[in-house]
């Protein structure tokens, strides 16, 4: 097991930034709300907005499992007839080395980029590329994890009428979202990853 993974167990116990309950944006800021209130708020807003397939965008983090990526893709397709689901597909390198173990180490530290590619999600190289693909008039943005966490993208997302974030940790996305639903850490899942 690599040092980066082996030594992150301490992060699993940090409770201050953990999202444990659904959060809803109110005039006073974010408040804990019940699951029922979270789902009702999302449903009411979607019924009010009546988004078309081109007005719904999804962003996923490649720390999500294959099962989560598949279900998120299915939600967008079956629920909104949208195939606008993007993941960070950044450039990475694999060093050439005479020492075998070094040839196994790449600059790609994402655990499931290959899984996202195999599920035929749309890769984006940068947040600027994502910004260019979000059309004017987008009504719903669904974000799984914290992909493309960039000030310009977060600022543009603030203009979208409904932003939903599913994440285990607080981030710029949870602060931008109208509703944030708690996600799970890798240690809390029985899931698969394709690296």
Language-model segments: residues:
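Catalytic alpha/large subunits of respiratory electron-transfer oxidoreductases
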Residues: 1-189, 194
């Amino acid at each position: 097991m690599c040092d980066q993974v082996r030594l992150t167990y301490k992060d699993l116990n940090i409770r201050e930034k953990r999202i444990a309950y659904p959060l809803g944006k109110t005039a006073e800021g974010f408040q804990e709300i019940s699951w029922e209130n979270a789902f009702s708020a999302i449903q009411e807003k979607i019924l009010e907005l009546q988004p078309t397939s081109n007005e719904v965008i999804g962003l996923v983090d490649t720390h999500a499992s294959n099962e989560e990526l598949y279900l998120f893709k299915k939600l967008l397709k079956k629920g909104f007839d949208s195939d606008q689901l993007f993941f960070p597909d950044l450039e990475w390198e694999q060093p050439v080395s005479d020492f075998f173990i070094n040839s196994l180490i790449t600059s790609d530290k994402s655990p499931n980029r290959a899984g996202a590619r195999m599920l035929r999600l749309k890769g984006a190289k940068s947040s600027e590329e994502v910004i260019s693909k979000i059309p004017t008039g987008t009504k719903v943005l669904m974000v799984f994890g914290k992909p493309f966490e960039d000030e310009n993208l977060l600022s543009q997302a603030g203009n979208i009428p409904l932003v939903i974030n599913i994440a285990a940790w607080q981030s710029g996305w949870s602060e931008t979202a109208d509703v944030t639903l708690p996600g799970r850490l890798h240690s809390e899942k029985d899931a698969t990853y394709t690296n």
